[in-house]
């Protein structure tokens, strides 16, 4: 037995730690295949955190067919206009993000819906290069394994829309007292633009800036036909 391997074998605690870390790294890629099954309703790491802290949360799973198309269109135009055309990562956007960072300029988020879904399902919420490095391969894998419809369905059912409010059905009921299937274009656009910061941006009580931004997204959503074909064709 080589000396290096013998050194490792003689340290059972270190061996267990390494194996545990490897299992945690591999587990998300295994779970992605389980999420192919439509009757499995994934939860996010934020939901698990709320359970551990005994806060509880409101999430009511609905299928994509039970969600207003206006909401899907608004979220795509607000969060990821190239959703139907990339493979999980918008590399052109990522390149500009890296260039801005190297220049010391303020950066945009650069996260696609698959990247946000991977983060919500498997990673933590704070921004860091370590998290982003883990997020990229998970996003590509998620986009490759899941259909665009299934991926969108999962995203809209785990996204945070306020303290303890997860998923579009709970958000629609909480902010507008209607089911997700009955959201108007204005309500849908308000929910969409609140996604980047749902704690500070209240879709049910929007300020002037949020209403103005929602108006922009509402107009984009109305002309989004070519951009949403992977969802509704």
From Swiss-Prot:
SUPFAM superfamilies: Lysozyme-like (SSF53955). Its EC number is 2.4.99.28. The keyword Glycosyltransferase applies. Pathway: Cell wall biogenesis; peptidoglycan biosynthesis. GO terms for molecular function: pentosyltransferase activity; peptidoglycan glycosyltransferase activity. It is a single-pass membrane protein. The chain crosses the membrane at residues 17-37. GO terms for cellular component: peptidoglycan-based cell wall; plasma membrane. It catalyses: [GlcNAc-(1->4)-Mur2Ac(oyl-L-Ala-gamma-D-Glu-L-Lys-D-Ala-D-Ala)](n)-di-trans,octa-cis-undecaprenyl diphosphate + beta-D-GlcNAc-(1->4)-Mur2Ac(oyl-L-Ala-gamma-D-Glu-L-Lys-D-Ala-D-Ala)-di-trans,octa-cis-undecaprenyl diphosphate = [GlcNAc-(1->4)-Mur2Ac(oyl-L-Ala-gamma-D-Glu-L-Lys-D-Ala-D-Ala)](n+1)-di-trans,octa-cis-undecaprenyl diphosphate + di-trans,octa-cis-undecaprenyl diphosphate + H(+). It is an enzyme of class 2 (transferase). Keywords: Cell inner membrane, Cell membrane, Cell shape, Cell wall biogenesis/degradation, Glycosyltransferase, Membrane, Peptidoglycan synthesis, Transferase, Transmembrane, Transmembrane helix. It is found in: Cell inner membrane. GO terms for biological process: cell wall organization; peptidoglycan biosynthetic process; regulation of cell shape. Belongs to the glycosyltransferase 51 family. Peptidoglycan polymerase that catalyzes glycan chain elongation from lipid-linked precursors. This is Biosynthetic peptidoglycan transglycosylase. It comes from Rhizobium etli (strain CIAT 652). The gene is mtgA.
